From Swiss-Prot:
It comes from Staphylococcus aureus (strain JH9). One of its GO terms (biological process) is glycine decarboxylation via glycine cleavage system. Belongs to the GcvH family. This is Glycine cleavage system H protein. The keyword Nucleotide-binding does not apply. The glycine cleavage system catalyzes the degradation of glycine. The H protein shuttles the methylamine group of glycine from the P protein to the T protein.
């Protein structure tokens, strides 16, 4: 199962890619495989504020609905609108086409609480 080294991970199975003061957030390959076929993705609006640990959307699969938890706090600067029409991208390409939101980071110290790829792999038993 892919766990890219350049990303950071939350214990709730979100990944974070940091570029400058913007973090791109999505769900991991492990999370999508546990959920099964994704049929709907609900995301926040651009300019919404999200707070670390709070829900910022949900992913609905044929099995269940799973909340998305913000791994960091910040202002949503971009939302992946393609997921509205193509939620299957979450299954097909969780780290590329299925990024969910881009957030302007409000507290960089929150990044320190995220897991490295190695620690995340250990957590999921890989």
């Amino acid at each position: 199962m892919a766990v890219p080294n350049e990303l950071k991970y939350s214990k709730e199975h979100e990944w974070v890619k940091v570029e400058g003061n913007v973090a791109t957030i999505g769900i991991t390959e492990y999370a999508q495989s546990e959920l099964g076929d994704i049929v709907f993705v609900e995301l926040p609006e651009t300019d919404d504020e999200i707070n670390e640990g709070d829900t910022f959307g949900s992913v609905e699969s044929v099995k269940t609905v799973s909340e998305l938890y913000a791994p960091i706090s910040g202002k949503v600067v971009e939302v992946n609108e393609e997921l509205e029409d193509s939620p299957e991208f979450v299954n097909e390409s969780p780290y590329e086409k299925a990024w969910m939101v881009k957030v302007e980071i409000s507290d960089e110290s929150q990044l320190e609480a995220l897991l490295t790829a190695e620690k995340y792999s250990e957590m999921i038993g890989e």
